[in-house]
Structures are given as structure tokens and as C-alpha cells.
Design a protein with these regions (language model features):
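C-terminal transmembrane helix end/exit motif
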Residues: 116-117, 202-209
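Alpha-helical transition-metal enzyme core signature, strongest for iron centers
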Residues: 68-76, 98-113, 131-138, 159-166, ...
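C-terminal, helix-dominated tail/subdomain
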Residues: 208-227
Length: 227
């Protein structure tokens, strides 16, 4: 089963429930629309938030959505093989939950491209599926998402550091004057918190077990690995 968010209230509080994996479905999940929402900063500060893409910002908004969308399946491509070496059922379940939510985030970005950006958006959405992490001919757009994730320590580091950077990126997009993008990213933030939890607790467990093993072996110098 997965413990996943299924709604979020206007104050930002998410509601979670347990869903059996065969029953899990990707959906277009948006935070509730804020009545009379205005653009919070920039040259258009104080104006009503855009419900459609303004022509003068079309290319820039499409680029932001494409870059964000490109990172989501990339992390799944980097991490999916780790199920073969999961340290525990708990870790495997966390891996599955992170991966299905990253996949849903791609789905959400594709929805925006398809619904609001016409033929250009559809072509960009196709390219999101064409590119592959680490592929020599069609790599992902950002270098970090073309690196290998060979083991679980790398996975914990990724979810602790890279997903933390991703959280800041989603926070910035959640402030967008383009309201559908803002609402989409506000919901995605409810799921991103769990990804960082997986990283933080995973690293904590690794450090704790290392300290326990050193104490059991009588090692006080971490460089003294011969013993």
C-alpha cells in the first residue's frame, strides 16, 4: 500500500490516506483555487492571477514547466533498479511511493503542457517521454538527473539534498502568476515533504548503524577500517 495525499485544503493542510498499490491511480490533483488571487510579485504585482497563458510570457512559462517536468521521470529512471537491493520492506515501500509520486508529478506537468500550450505543448510533452536519464543521445536536461544512483546511500543522499532543492523550486513555482501552475505545485509540495523524510531518516539510520558497528568493534577512529 501507499500512504499518499489525496487533497489539500485552502490553508495548505494535506489529507492523507492509505491506498493499495493495485488501486493507485495517477490523477490531476490541484490545490483549491484561491478566490480573487493576485500575482504576488514582479511587474504585474497585484493584478489578478492569470487563468490562461499570457502571450508575452508563453515561452518562458513553457520552458519552466518543461524543465520541472523533465526532472520527475528522470529520478524514477535513476532509482527504479534499487528495488532489487532494498534493505527492508519498509525501504522498498518508500522507494515505490517516491517513484509513483514522481511519476504523477510528470503527469501533472504534461497536463499543463497539453491543456494550455497547444501544439508546442504537445510536442514538448512527447519529448519528456523521449529523453532518458544518462542516455548518450537524448539525456535529461539537468546534469544531476543524468548521474547514476548505484546504491541506497546515494538514494538517501538524493532524497535529502536534491529533493530539498526541488522543494525550493516548487515553492517558487507555487508563487507563479499563472494560477494553474501555482495550484499544481502547491499540491506537489504535499508529496515532496515525504521524499525529504525518506532521505533524512535514511541517512540517520546509516549513521546510527555505523556508530553502533564501530562501538561493537571497539573502533574510535573512523579511518581505522582494517579492524
Amino acid at each position: 500500500y501507499l500512504r499518499t495525499a489525496y487533497s489539500v485544503d485552502p490553508r495548505g493542510w494535506a489529507k492523507f490516506d492509505y491506498v493499495r498499490m493495485p488501486e493507485y491511480r495517477w490523477g490531476i490533483l490541484l490545490a483549491p483555487q484561491e478566490e480573487n488571487r493576485v500575482i504576488p510579485f514582479g511587474e504585474d504585482y497585484g493584478k489578478p492571477a492569470w487563468q490562461e497563458v499570457p502571450g508575452e510570457h508563453r515561452a518562458m512559462l513553457r520552458r519552466l514547466i518543461v524543465i520541472q517536468g523533465d526532472t520527475e521521470p528522470a529520478s524514477v529512471e535513476q532509482q527504479r533498479h534499487l528495488g532489487k537491493t532494498a534493505p527492508s520492506l519498509y525501504d522498498m515501500r518508500n522507494l515505490f511511493q517516491v517513484n509513483v509520486e514522481e511519476g504523477r508529478h510528470l503527469w501533472a506537468m504534461v497536463y499543463l503542457l497539453q491543456k494550455y500550450f497547444g501544439r508546442d505543448g504537445r510536442e514538448e510533452a512527447d519529448d519528456l517521454l523521449r529523453r532518458r536519464s544518462g542516455d548518450a543521445d537524448s539525456p535529461r536536461m539537468l546534469g544531476a538527473f543524468n548521474e547514476a544512483t548505484p546504491d541506497w546511500l546515494s538514494f538517501f543522499m538524493f532524497t535529502y539534498f536534491t529533493d530539498r532543492d526541488g522543494k525550493m523550486q516548487l515553492h517558487s513555482l507555487a508563487q507563479s502568476g499563472f494560477d494553474p501552475l501555482s495550484r499544481t505545485c502547491r499540491f506537489m509540495l504535499t508529496e515532496e515533504a515525504h521524499h525529504m523524510f525518506v532521505g533524512e531518516t535514511g541517512i540517520t539510520r546509516v549513521v546510527q548503524r555505523t556508530c553502533d558497528a564501530m562501538n561493537e568493534a571497539g573502533i574510535t577512529d573512523p579511518n581505522d577500517i582494517a579492524r
